[in-house]
Amino acid sequence: MTSIINQRWPLGNLMDGFPNGEKQNKLSFGGVPEKGYFEEFNKDPKYISFSGTPEKAYFEEFNRYRNIDEDDNRDTFPLFNEISSNPESESYLQTFVDNVRINTDINFVSKTNSFSQNDLSYLNATYVDKSLSLELPIKFNWAKTTSADSPDVVAKKKLISKPDNQYLCGSCWAVSVAGVVGDVFAVAGLVNWVPNISATYALIHYPQGRCKGGDPATLLYNIANNGIPSKHCVDYSWCSQNRTCTTADSAAHFGSDLSPLIPKDRGCYFDSEHYIFKIDSNIRTIVAGSGAIDVSNVQRTIKEYIYTTGPAVGGYIIFRNFTSKVPFGPHKGNSTFNVINGGVYLEKANYAQYRGEYGEHITEGLTFSSSNTDSDNYAGGHAISIMGWGIQPRIRVGNGPNDIADVPYWYCRNSWGTKWGMNGGYFKIAMYPYNRKSQFSKIVELMTPQGQHIRLGGVLAFTVSNPPVLKKLPANKQPPNPNSLSKLLDYYKNDEDDIVTKLPNIVPPSDGKKSTTSKTNNWYIYALIIIFILIIFFVLRK
């Protein structure tokens, strides 16, 4: 059955090939350098370029970390608090880690249709119908519950995905999409459990560049056409339980690409039933200057979409200062912006030069320079999940004594683990115009020092209309080694085969797991019917 939503947002055109035939300009998300694979070491062992950004990297630094003791385990990745007492060496290593986790292009517009006037009208009508208000809340966040939330919203927030860790595989294009797809099903009331969509399934079946990056828009079309299961089928154990993918000795493997670690078999771990999630094919890009969206309505449109539909996939430019680290103390290894000046990332801030105290309330000592957004400081592109928005009061935005402002921000879920960021893996990023390049609202064009043309920006929008379908999926020929998995075997043997309801006001159990209430209620109904029939039978016999 075709939904009203599908009629409103018809299938966008999926472009084959590249704009103007310029294949060399085609980049991919994922956090893995386009240039700088292992052969680059053979050409010049003293110099290598990651993500189009030159890095001074000496081959000896890689050799130094090839045989790290087992004590330096993945618990500290990606912060590497225990690696070395040599700050310079640690800085080299962290630079490589930062580059491998960052994507290199977010050109959603080339893959999807623009947000049309019909789309905009439908979204506005949906928002007004749901909120009974013309005013959006000043702050809203799918990752946090508040006293202002209705019971329905609280129930759905319990089903929202938590931050994952992509580790050293450049898979944020898959991890961000997997999280958001599950979130949108939860917000739509089509599931009463945390979906936990499998990013690994995407890397296997819709691989693109796998650990070398990919395009979230293309992946969404794949999911619309063919679906995707949960982590019960296959999860991220191939990386999270593999030292090569999680620890500092991975530095020796950056050039050789971690994609071969991804499972070769295309089946699930076990021959069992799993829920298949399919999204509607109405994938759109919300970005100013495209379709019915301009600077005047882009932020409200993104907010309305998130408020009514759920978290969204956003793409943005990362400059070097985004990953500038706290050098010491309890926050060591975290990006500096997370722990000062309200925790809001401002693209022109000199985070690398900051040497003051740490704390979100600290605003003094932070300086600003426009050079931070020069093309020389371009590090890559990144795909994340936008969870909501807010306003950070009275933070520093410039070098003047009166450069203090209430700054609107997007609240985002990253894929760098729970030890990075704030509140266990999240971060705030200033909205346009406080950030004019590192933001979601506008397309930004940039030329790298290597002459590579970059076009980034936008928010992907889609809907879901039908609940996931329980389906038996093929299993791998060989069962997995239990020691190589992150969970007990029973977790992977099936999804709980409860009834999936489409009621919009579904209230899940408090632990966020799937409910068997529906099945229990059905047995009561069947028993009552049988008793009623027996009573009628005996009455008629008399």
Swiss-Prot record:
Pfam families: Peptidase_C1. It is a single-pass membrane protein. InterPro entries: Papain-like_cys_pep_sf (IPR038765), Pept_cys_AS (IPR000169), Peptidase_C1A (IPR013128), Peptidase_C1A_C (IPR000668). The keyword NAD does not apply. The chain crosses the membrane at residues 520-540. SMART domains: Pept_C1. The active site is at 172, 382, 414. GO terms for biological process: proteolysis. One of its GO terms (molecular function) is cysteine-type peptidase activity. Keywords: Hydrolase, Membrane, Protease, Thiol protease, Transmembrane, Transmembrane helix. One of its GO terms (cellular component) is membrane. It is found in: Membrane. It comes from the Viruses. Its EC number is 3.4.22.-. Its main location: membrane. Belongs to the peptidase C1 family. Probable cysteine protease. This is Probable cysteine proteinase 361L. It comes from Invertebrate iridescent virus 6.
